[in-house]
Swiss-Prot record:
Consequence of gene loss (knockout): General developmental defects, including apoptosis in the central nervous system and a dorsally curved tail, which appear by 28 hpf. Effects are due to general cell cycle defects, including defects in the G2/M checkpoint.
Pathway membership, UniProt: Protein modification; protein ubiquitination
GO biological process terms held by the UniProt record: DNA damage response; DNA replication; mitotic G2 DNA damage checkpoint signaling; proteasome-mediated ubiquitin-dependent protein catabolic process; protein monoubiquitination; protein polyubiquitination; regulation of cell cycle; response to UV
Basic and acidic residues bias: start-end ranges: 543-558
Chief location of this protein within or outside the cell: nucleus
Protein name: Denticleless protein homolog
One of the record's GO molecular function terms: protein-macromolecule adaptor activity
Length: 647
């Protein structure tokens, strides 16, 4: 019996200071995993540049269980000897000209199979380095390769083309390559919501969709295969004794395990692993959860969920400890997580040290004290369990330690009645924001407040600004006047309190005249910069084509207003509107003639739509171009008829 089995069967014993022995559970040893600098290895490519490793796995051959095979992005395969205290490189060669995404040992032998992005799988002899065979048939990159633990000649591959292929090395080669003996096409294709209009042409290969890719294949026994897809969210079990090539539509699996999460869109799986009994399936989902299914029963819902890590890619894998008590998985937050399978809600242990996403993780099948991990920081690390007496520190010096273990601190659950304070985005720098003049001093209701804006995680919250209701000033002169300390601003049209504005959502406020006549005037910051365009629009909406006198007065008042605009930074309409109001108050104290009243009334109609009284107005006929002299009496209409009769 090995030391590992003795520890598992009898438990972990620690000797106290008084000499007595105490029995501890095996989970109490998890915090002893450490990675020394001598167990950190950099993965290199063809040009001696560091490249990320994609897959790692321990050998199952007798006497070779300490051999670790690692494949990287440049197609290189490296064999490490992890049996010694300092792991060393046994062999290294370039297996493919493209990336190797997965690797699998042939059970009980010194051979392994590599699945590459060059659409082929290759069988290698590790001792001699010879290529024993090439397997062709996929139309896209191969993402996964798997053997049954008691079968040496048959293995399976899954690719991005959505096909699952079964290979047998006992079959003869054709054109120098091995061909698949069984194929499951479209294993994880999403069902189409509509019928494709284009017809399939004879002799043309089917189009390849990246969303139908097969991410993982795994044997559960010699006749059943488990697979997962990228986006369909379904784990499927296939009976290899069936002929799936006869299906004209999507093939029907023996059993299907639908996505059990709460996400609205279906997600995919990046890794699948079985315990050593073959009854519990652990699936790494891209929703940051690991679901455990009991595949020996009839239920298709998970029996446990492991959470706490992060999974944002299809390279994160998981592995089960040789005693079936713990689950280890990579994570996108640069850590390796270890859960106790019998207690999924317990906080996991974190193996910290990597600086990028941890992808593949392998637990030595014959040594509980050894874990291998691959990361996007271009390193492969061997984590060893450093058993030390109680009360003593690690035997490895801090300078030589590149990885350590801590327990993840779970966030406390919120009480049902507790609500966190609303975080507000800090106010922006006024100098960096372009100033745009509004059509009214009142804020538009569609403008978002501070609570409605997104808050970055690295910014501090600011108190919300108090919104005060605008008040009408006592004097118009006081409203447009500003002090020396006040910022430069435009004199904008004040809104009458008696009018109701309901079209604020479009950031447009209507004046009284436009509201009554049905001709809305769009007032925004852009039109304020072009007073000539604004005057032309107002003249079109208020004047008639035959009113030549009104047009001349409009041009005259507009030119005067332009001069005032350059001095007081106000619009020409503002100066004309104020002058009309002043004339109104001046003229109210003295009697007015019909002609003067008509002129003032026309000026108000032309220049101040907002100041028009809601009561009906009298319409005056426009005066003629030649003014009648006051000494000459006006002719009667009857005199014209008399002349016409005399002629």
């Amino acid at each position: 019996m090995t030391l590992f089995h003795h520890v598992v069967d009898r438990g972990a014993k620690k000797r106290g200071r008084n000499g007595e022995q105490r029995l501890f559970p095996l989970s109490s040893l998890l915090d002893g995993y450490e990675c020394a600098r001598r167990d950190e290895h950099i993965s290199y490519g063809a040009s001696a540049a560091a490249v990320p490793p994609f897959g790692c796995t321990f050998s199952s051959a007798h006497g070779q269980q300490n051999c670790l095979a690692v494949a990287n992005e440049e197609g290189f395969v490296t064999i490490f000897n992890t049996g010694e205290k300092q792991s060393s490189v046994l062999k290294e060669w370039q297996a493919h000209d493209n990336a190797v995404f997965d690797i699998a040992w042939v059970p009980g032998t010194n051979c392994l199979v590599t699945a590459s992005g060059d659409q082929t799988a290759r069988l290698w002899d590790v001792i001699t380095g010879d290529l024993l065979g090439t397997f062709k048939g996929h139309q896209c990159s191969l993402k996964s390769v798997a053997f049954y633990k008691q079968e040496k000649a048959v293995f399976s591959t899954g690719g991005r083309d959505g096909n699952i292929m079964i290979w047998d090395t006992r079959c003869s080669k054709k054109d120098g390559f091995y061909r698949q003996v069984k194929q499951i096409s479209g294993a994880h294709m999403k069902p189409e919501r509509f019928t494709p209009q284009t017809k399939k042409r004879r002799g043309m290969a089917p189009p390849v969709d990246s969303q139908q890719g097969v991410t993982v294949v795994l044997f559960c026994d010699e006749t059943k295969l488990i697979s997962s897809g990228a986006v369909d969210g379904i784990i499927k079990m296939w009976d290899l004794r069936r002929n799936y090539t006869a299906y004209h539509q999507n093939p029907l699996p023996l059993q299907a395990y639908p996505y059990p999460g709460s996400c609205t869109r279906k997600l995919g799986y990046s890794g699948l692993s079985l315990d050593y009994t073959g009854s519990r399936l652990f699936s790494n989902c891209t929703d940051d959860n690991i679901y455990m299914f009991n595949i020996s029963g009839l239920k298709t819902t998970p029996v446990a969920v492991f959470s706490g890590h992060s999974n944002s890619s299809f390279y994160v894998k998981s592995t089960v400890s040789p005693d079936d008590q713990f689950l280890a998985s990579g994570s996108s937050d640069h850590n390796v997580y270890i859960w106790k399978i019998s207690d999924p809600k317990q906080a996991p242990m974190m193996l910290q040290g990597h600086s990028q996403e941890v992808t593949s993780v392998a637990w030595c099948p014959t040594d509980f004290t050894k874990i291998a991990s691959c990361s996007d920081d271009n390193t492969v690390r061997i984590w060893r369990l450093n058993r030390k007496p109680e009360g003593e520190n690690s035997t490895i010096q801090d300078g030589n330690l590149v990885g350590w273990t801590i327990r993840k601190v779970q966030s406390p659950n919120r009480t049902p009645g507790h609500h966190s304070p609303v975080e507000l985005t800090p106010s922006k720098n006024p100098g960096s924001v372009r100033s745009v003049s509004l059509a009214s001093p009142q804020p538009a209701t569609c403008a978002p407040t501070g609570a409605a804006l997104p808050l970055p995680s690295n910014t501090s919250s600011a108190p919300p600004a108090k919104l005060t209701s605008p008040k009408m000033p006592s004097s118009l002169q006081q409203w447009i006047s500003r002090s020396s300390k006040s910022p430069v601003r435009k004199a904008l049209t004040p809104v009458l309190q008696g009018l109701s504005f309901e079209h604020r959502v479009k950031r447009r406020l209507e004046t009284g005249d436009s509201a009554s006549s049905g001709l809305g005037e769009e007032i925004d910051g852009v039109s304020e910069l072009y007073p000539n365009v604004k005057r032309s629009r107002s003249s079109v909406s208020t004047l008639k084509k035959e009113d030549s006198f009104g047009l001349e007065s409009e041009k005259r008042l507009g030119s005067d207003g332009a001069e005032a605009s350059g001095k007081e930074n106000s619009s020409p309409r503002r100066t004309d509107w104020l002058s009309v109001i002043s004339q109104k108050f001046k003229g109210s104290a003295q009697p007015k003639s019909p002609s003067s009243g008509s002129s003032q009334q026309d000026t108000r109609t032309l220049e101040s739509p907002a100041a028009v009284s809601p009561r009906p107005m009298k319409v005056f006929s426009p005066p003629t171009n030649k003014k009648a002299s006051p000494s000459k009496p006006m002719k009667k209409i009857s005199s014209y008829f008399m002349k016409r009769t005399q002629d």
